[in-house]
A protein has these predicted regions:
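Conserved, mostly hydrophobic/aromatic
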Residues: 19, 84, 111, 125, ...
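Glycine-rich phosphate-binding active-site loops on the catalytic face of alpha/beta enzymes
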Residues: 25-38, 83-99, 146-158
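N-terminal pre-domain/capping segments
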Residues: 1-27, 32-39
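Hydrophobic faces of well-ordered beta-strands that scaffold small-molecule active sites
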Residues: 4-10, 27-29, 48, 56-60, ...
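Active-site mouth loops of central-metabolism enzymes
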Residues: 2-12, 60-78, 97, 122-134
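Glycine-enriched alpha-helix->loop->beta-strand junction motifs that scaffold or abut catalytic
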Residues: 21-27, 51-55, 88-91, 116-119, ...
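Active-site-adjacent beta->alpha loops and helix N-cap segments on the catalytic face
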Residues: 13-17, 33-57, 72-75, 96-116, ...
């Protein structure tokens, strides 16, 4: 049986360094974890990568408060994603929804394609936990080539959503 990889959610370069020292296999780098995680600064990514050399997935989320973004917010996310990939990100973590709660496949495709073209991973984050039909959503993400999904099984706590997570796998 293969060993489970340990990925740690980090809010700073210091967090990444500590996770690396503690044996994490990879990290997800964010800023503002208090608000669910936002796009980290390039400086945090550069320092974390330089100090650890470990795989770093980076959150691409322009603001707190849901997963429906204006055109300008989405354009900001795209530009951030390009810069993060150019400066060492090993993948992008993101989630885009329509106002009705369904996945915005067009916007999701844009970031998935950016990651794929750079030879990196794309992870759809916990926005999947608020979609009305996770099965349909998951099928759409698979069709787009999304590498992984970050979920708590449509519950606030993964311990409560374990059954759904098992179904998703």
């Amino acid at each position: 049986m293969s060993r489970v990889r340990l990925e740690v959610c980090c809010g700073s370069a210091d967090d990444v360094i500590q996770a690396h020292r503690a044996g994490a296999d990879r990290v997800e780098l964010n800023s503002d974890l208090f608000h669910g995680g936002l796009t980290p600064t390039l400086g945090e990514l550069i320092v974390a990568k330089r100090e650890t050399g470990m795989p770093i997935m980076t959150m691409v989320r322009p603001r707190e408060g849901g997963f429906c973004y204006t055109a300008a917010e989405f354009d900001t996310a795209v530009e951030d994603a390009k810069l993060l990939l150019r400066h060492g990100a090993d993948g992008l973590v993101f989630g885009f929804l329509h106002p009705d709660g369904t996945i915005d496949l067009e916007r999701t495709r844009v970031l998935a394609d950016l990651a794929r073209e750079a030879g990196k991973e794309s992870v759809f984050h916990r926005a999947i936990d608020v979609v009305p039909d996770w099965r349909k959503a998951l099928d759409g993400l698979i069709a787009l080539g999304i590498t992984r999904v970050l979920t708590s099984g449509q519950e606030p706590d993964v311990a409560l959503g374990t059954g759904t997570v098992r179904e998703m796998i």
